Each structure stands twice: as C-alpha cells, then as structure tokens.
Amino acid sequence: MTISPPERGSDAKSQVEKVDNPATFELFGKPGHFDRALAKGPKTTTWVWNLHANAHDFDAHTSDLQEVSRRIFSAHFGHLAVIFIWLSGAFFHGARFSNYSGWLADPTHVKPSAQVVWPIFGQEILNGDMGAGFNGIQITSGLFHVWRGWGITSETQLMALAIGALVMAGLMLNAGVFHYHKSAPKLEWFQNVESMLNHHLAGLLGLGSLSWAGHLIHVSLPVTKLMDAIDAGEPLVLNGTTIASAADIPLPHEFFNQDLLAQLYPGIGSGISAFFSGNWAAYGDFLTFKGGLNPVTGSLWMTDIAHHHVAIAVLFIVAGHMYRTNWGIGHSIKEIHEGQKGDPLLFPAPNGHDGLYEFMTTSWHAQLAVNLAMLGSLSIIVAQHMYAMPPYAYMAVDYPTQIGLFTHHIWIGGFLIVGGAAHAAIAMVRDYDPAKHIDNVLDRVLKARDAIISHLNWVCIWLGAHSFGLYIHNDTMRALGRPQDMFSDQAISIQPIFAQWIQNAHAAAAGSTAPNALAGVSEVFNGSVVAVGGKVAAAPMPLGTADFMVHHIHAFTIHVTVLILLKGVLYARSSRLIPDKANLGFRFSCDGPGRGGTCQVSAWDHVFLGLFWMYNSLSIVIFHFSWKMQSDIWGTVNADGSVAHITNGNFAQSAITINGWLRDYLWAQAVQVINSYGSSTSAYGIMFLGAHFIWAFSLMFLFSGRGYWQELIESIVWAHNKLKVAPAIQPRALSIIQGRAVGVAHYLLGGIATTWAFFHAHILVVG
C-alpha cells in the first residue's frame, strides 16, 4: 500500500449543488424537447426515427460533461424504478396466479406455473396440467426455485414483496427527480473514483453480501433445512411441534429468537462472542465447506452458499479500504495507472498508461465499454454455473428452466459484449484526443492495429477452414459409407485432452489440493450421478471427438465476432481507405456520393455486422448445450441405477456431421413444436411460425436499397395527391442506417423468438 504524507489528503467539501430546475410535464410532453431541430415538430416521417435515435444520446443534447453525467445518473434511478415494477409484477403473479404452495409441497411432481389464461375464444387450451389439480402455463424462469432459496413459504409473503417492490419503485423515481431537479452532484463527485470504489466495494458489494449472508443464515437456512426434511420424509421438530408442511414453518421474524434457530443449528447458540474470541469453529455447522450437491434437492448446500457470502463480504470490505480519499493513505488510481510503463521487449510503450486515467474519467463511453464487456462475460459465466453448480433447490431437475436460464444468460452476455464494442467505438470517435495519448498503451495498440487485425483475420480463416473442414470430411465419408475413415470416437479419435485434464484435476481436488472440501466443485467434472425424484440432477459429462469438433466451431465464430467488433473500434477514427473517418462520426452509411465502395465502414456498421455474428456464434452454443445435456446428462434413473437419457446418448455419433446436426437435432427436436396444435403448447407452434415471419421480414430491409423504397413512396404519394388525401407530414424512405437498424432488430427478434418456441415446445413435452 502506498502511504503518503498527510498533506496528500484532501478536505471533505460539498460535492452537491442545489438546483432550481423544476420538473414540468409541459416540457416532457413536448416530443423532441431535447433537440432544437426535433423540437420544431415533424415535417417528414424521418422525424420519428431521429426522435428514437437521439432521445437517449445525451452527448447530442449538450456538450457539458457535468450535465451529461447528471442525466445519466438520474436515468439510472429511472431504470431501477422500472426494474422494481417488473419485479413487483413477478411477485404479484406468484402471489395471485401461481401454484407456488402446491409446488413447494411436491416439487418433483408439480410443475411451476404463475399464469392462468382466461377463456375468451378458446385459448384456455394453453392451461396445461401442472399436477395437484392446477392448470396453467408452465414457467421456466426459475422464480419458484429462487423464492424457496430466499425462504419464502407462502403466497402472502409474495404479495408483501409485490407491494414492497412498488414502494421501492416510487422511491427510485423520487430519487431520480430529486438528484437532477433539486440537488444534483457536481462533476467532481462523478470523477472521484477512489471514493466511488470504496463505496461500491465496501458498501454495495461488501455490506450488501454481508447483509445477504445475514438473511441466508437467519431466514434461508432454517426454512430450507425444515423444507428439505419434509421433502425427505423425515420432518424435524421445533419447540415440540412437528414441522410437517410449509404452513407449519415459523415466520421469518420468529427466527429472531436465537433459541429457535439453535435447535436447528447449535452453532448459532454460541452467539457473537465466538466470533470475537476467535472460536470460529463454533460456526462450522451453518458455515460449511462441503462441496457437491444436496442429495434431497440437487442444489448447492445452503450452508456453503451462506459461507460463500460471508467470505465475499470480508474480501470486498477489505477491498473497499484500499483507495486514497480524504486521508493520506491508500492507493491512487491515477498513480497506479502512471506507474505502468509496459514491458520493454514485448510491449514497448514509453508512456505506459499515461492519459488513460483522464480518458476513463472524462469519457462515459470508455467507462461503459469496459463495464459492458466485463458484465457480458460474467453473464456467460453465470450461464455455465446454472447447470454445473445449480444453486437453487430442484432447479437441476426442471429441465425447461435449465435450458431457459442457460439460453437467457448466454444471449444477454452476447448483447452486452457487442454493446461494449459499440461504446468503445463511440468513445474513440467522440472522446479520444490523439494529442493526449502519445506513445501510451492505447496509442501503441492503434499503431499496431494492422498487425492485430490481419493476424486475427488469419486466425479466423485457420479456425474456420479446419473446424468446418472436419465436418465436411465427416459428411463426405458418411455419405460414401466409409465410417472407418471418419473423425469419431470409434474411428479417427480426436480427444479434448486439455478439457479432460481439467475435469480430472477438479475431481481429484477434494481431500488433496482442497483438503477441507468434502466433495468436488461440480459433478460435471467426473463426479457421480445425483438423482432427485428419479431424474438426473447432475452427472459427469463425458467429452469426446464430437465435443472437440463443435468446440472449435465455437472458437471460430467467437473469433470472427471479435474480429468485426475490434476492427470497428481500432478503425473508428481513421483507416487507409477513409483517413478522416473521425469527422464523419460514429454512424454514416457511405463516404459521400463522390466515392464508391466506401459503404459499411462506419463504427456503427461494425456493430451492425458484429450483431449477426454474435447471434450466429451463440445459436451454436445454446444448440450444443441443449443437445449435449439431453444426450449425455439429463434423463430418468432406472431401478438398476442405469440412466435412460432423453436422446439416448446420440450426441457423440450424430454431432460429428452437419447432416447429423440437421437431422438428429434440429429436425428431430422440432417434432414437438410442429405438432403442437391442439395441445397446451400450441402457442409455441404459432410463435415458431410467427417468429420465422419476423425473421424473414427483416431480410426485406437488409437486402434492398433506400432508393427502391423512395421511388415506390413517391408513386404512392402521387396517387394520394390525385385523390386529394395527401398527408401533411411528407413520407420518406428510411435512411440506409435506419433500414439496417430495423433489419437487424427484426432479424435478432425473429431468430431468438424462433429458438425460444423451438426449445420450449420440445423440452416442456419431453423434459
């Protein structure tokens, strides 16, 4: 830690300014009030598109960084309000329209539902049989599982949460108005990164985790222990009363009584004194390090989860005391940056990270780019953990929920990562000043961009040719009836030896490199089969030639996505083709009528193209996951202990040819969605077709030029004039950029909704 002389500290001073800027609906009610040109109202139909494009582009409203910062800050509260309203809706559906109590009583036979369709023209057919006499639409969001984990035992508690979330939404809206219109932070408050780090690390993440650990220990632990005992058929006794159902479980506030908790976890009876005396072992019964899964629920041990949150809290509270604020001790982010000079051989940047601190504290786009890339990656990591280390009770045997959560977190991650590239490019165009980045690391990367992009392009060609080449070879050999010459586990075997090594290393860790763990980190890593209610919750995942091949397709598609996005960022300001690109802005269709062959070079166009490859890449990821799990993990356990998998282990043989992917995965698993009419999954059949239409509709925007439509519009306007019904607002064709934006939006919406219908209709029937 850098200990500095006392004078390096700064006196605390007010970082907030009283503002007299009343929130008036007269202003808000005027469309385009934020832009002088838009405020005049529409003359042509282009106005409404520009309104959408610029409403949230605060940079375009004002160049005052403090004003932009305040608007972003205020908008965050608005965003939180929307999130609380959305949460309230989820809680309300659970309280009012769900079979939550029925599911709690028998989670392995009752399916979760929180929506009942009203009969108007026959759509009550969508209310499927959920078990225990309840008919509704099956939900796949994992809400019931997470609510049980929180310790919620009744619909009444969900209704209280629904009301509480609305109250929070009101508070957030109030805060958003207050901190912009009444009392707004000054620019230096937004740029005080050390204070922000301390508060976010120690407060938000540290104390947040600690308070959550408190909830887990005092509410979740007792409730889940009692619920697990009921589900195992061995109910526990509290104060002489047998807890035989969820209704018998004491309410959360009753667990304030330490004696009640101590009957379940004696360690809690030792109170706080054991903590201060160093006798931490006393807490070993409720802060555990077991590893593996709870055999009753197929989920991580709640005592492990509580321990995890205590540990996270300690780490982040310590981390939140590392940065120098008003006292003269701790790290300075600026000094850390400027202390990094780069490796003289590998990366000679004489000025290291000089200038980056200023860039990151004056460019919100640069800050957002880093955060989106990190959060997107984190979302994709969460997707992997949902099945490898299922945290919530019975979620691992609810296969529709498992596919739903994996797919959701993968898509979200992809969109956030593309967003990271978008904002990095905007930062380069709008906020980057070359004079402030001479020979620092960013400047050196830009100078080396040709080498970086050409090498990355070579990697993409190599990966694409070889990974796809393996499939082409296999299809050819299978077509010619030569299975002995195919790449497969039986013929020419290519084993993923590094992945298998990692699996073995994890499996061997418990009791050796992790001496205190009782079981491995995940059953997926060469563990054992965990069955709950006769269904597989987790099992070791065998990896072979088929996995090796599709993994390299993943490597190929991810690298192409990175190539497009990184090229957009590195060439956002200039290129050999268009040296003055920075003057043309973030989005432009072509470099003027005088220069042909300069279309799709703007940074925006790279984001546009990157989205297609992101979609392409992640479609294969979710298809791989869905098929692999159904083939090799999920299924029912027979009386002799053997497992009957959903697709009978066909992945290893079928996934090694393109024809196999089409025939044995896409076509075979589309049976349910195509045959869904007349059943409770028929909505997915209609959605499957409707989403295909939306996807196809996008091609109309992507495959045609603006001039075609402008010509058509002018003839239609002529006809209107003839009939004396000409509109006051002049119709205009979409601009080239607007057409691409509409096209990619429908392409992604159609593609994702098609996949949603395909997955759901299949897994709800067979899972």
From Swiss-Prot:
Q: Where in the cell is it found?
A: Cellular thylakoid membrane
Q: Which gene encodes it?
A: psaA
Q: How does it sit in the membrane?
A: Multi-pass membrane protein
Alphabetically, which GO biological process terms does the record hold?
Answer: photosynthesis
Q: How is the cofactor bound?
A: PSI electron transfer chain: 5 chlorophyll a, 1 chlorophyll a', 2 phylloquinones and 3 4Fe-4S clusters. PSI core antenna: 90 chlorophyll a, 22 carotenoids, 3 phospholipids and 1 galactolipid. P700 is a chlorophyll a/chlorophyll a' dimer, A0 is one or more chlorophyll a, A1 is one or both phylloquinones and FX is a shared 4Fe-4S iron-sulfur center.
Query: SUPFAM superfamilies in the record, alphabetically?
Result: Photosystem I subunits PsaA/PsaB
User: Where are its TM segments located?
Assistant: 72-95, 158-181, 197-221, 305-323, 364-387, 403-429, 451-473, 548-566, 606-627, 681-703, 741-761
Assembly with partners or alone: The PsaA/B heterodimer binds the P700 chlorophyll special pair and subsequent electron acceptors. PSI consists of a core antenna complex that captures photons, and an electron transfer chain that converts photonic excitation into a charge separation. The cyanobacterial PSI reaction center is composed of one copy each of PsaA,B,C,D,E,F,I,J,K,L,M and X, and forms trimeric complexes.
Q: Where does chlorophyll a' bind?
A: H692
Under the heading HAMAP family, the entry gives: PSI_PsaA
The catalysed reaction is: reduced [plastocyanin] + hnu + oxidized [2Fe-2S]-[ferredoxin] = oxidized [plastocyanin] + reduced [2Fe-2S]-[ferredoxin]
The protein, known as: Photosystem I P700 chlorophyll a apoprotein A1
What does the record give under GO molecular function? 4 iron, 4 sulfur cluster binding; chlorophyll binding; electron transfer activity; magnesium ion binding; oxidoreductase activity
Its biological purpose: PsaA and PsaB bind P700, the primary electron donor of photosystem I (PSI), as well as the electron acceptors A0, A1 and FX. PSI is a plastocyanin/cytochrome c6-ferredoxin oxidoreductase, converting photonic excitation into a charge separation, which transfers an electron from the donor P700 chlorophyll pair to the spectroscopically characterized acceptors A0, A1, FX, FA and FB in turn. Oxidized P700 is reduced on the lumenal side of the thylakoid membrane by plastocyanin or cytochrome c6.
Q: What is its EC number?
A: 1.97.1.12
Supply the Pfam families for this chain. Answer: PsaA_PsaB
Q: What class of enzyme is it?
A: oxidoreductase
Q: Where does chlorophyll a bind?
A: M700, Y708
- Which family is this protein grouped under? Belongs to the PsaA/PsaB family.
Q: Where does [4Fe-4S] cluster bind?
A: C590, C599
Q: Signal peptide position in this chain?
A: none
Keywords in UniProt for this one? 4Fe-4S, Chlorophyll, Chromophore, Electron transport, Iron, Iron-sulfur, Magnesium, Membrane, Metal-binding, Oxidoreductase, Photosynthesis, Photosystem I, Thylakoid, Transmembrane, Transmembrane helix, Transport
An annotated GO cellular component: plasma membrane-derived thylakoid membrane
Q: Which parts of the sequence bind phylloquinone?
A: W709
